[in-house]
Amino acid sequence: MESPMHLPEVIAVEQESQQMGLSVTAPELHGSLSGLLAGGGCNGPDWLAMILADAEVAAPPKGSVLERLYQATASQLEDPDFAFQLLLADDGATLAARADALFEWCRAFLGGFGLAAHSRSVLSAEGDEILRDLAKLAQASVDDFDMNEDKEDGSLEEIEEYVRVAVLLLHGDCLIGPCAPQRLN
């Protein structure tokens, strides 16, 4: 049996999304969900309808891939060992596809975060800076970069790690508060 904190595979998320008639990619869905949860929003079965802005969308069935995606994401965000991971492109994807998935994930994260945190007016200085950084990534495209596989692969991994930690910091800001001391080590 899979660990409750293990994210489903990208292909499984996309297949189930298509079966449900959803026009959303796995990175977009996970980014929106992560933003919603990081901002302290929707702790229940209506999460999918909320992030898709469609009240007609049914909640994912119990035990489904999308329900497991929700459970794993929520568990990872709460994990004291900072287990949160981004659901991006498959491992075999090209650098350009991976970068595009990351930019798409960031766009979706900001949308989900905005849904949850719209009433919160105060973030820490770090939280404000993180949102600005994520907005820059959300506006980026692979056309903005020289996609040299050898040189850029490590850089993309560093950006992915920055985004991962940034989400945890924003989650702490929203659920613990901007004035509480936060330590990641």
UniProtKB/Swiss-Prot annotation:
Q: Matching InterPro entries, A to Z?
A: YgfB-like (IPR011978), YgfB-like_sf (IPR036255)
Q: Which GO terms describe its cellular component?
A: cytosol
Write down the superkingdom of origin. Bacteria
- UniProt record similarity statement: Belongs to the UPF0149 family.
Q: Which NCBIfam families match?
A: PRK04758.1, ygfB_yecA
Protein name according to UniProt: UPF0149 protein Xfasm12_0965
Q: Which organism is it from?
A: Xylella fastidiosa (strain M12)
Q: What is the lineage of its organism?
A: Bacteria, Pseudomonadati, Pseudomonadota, Gammaproteobacteria, Lysobacterales
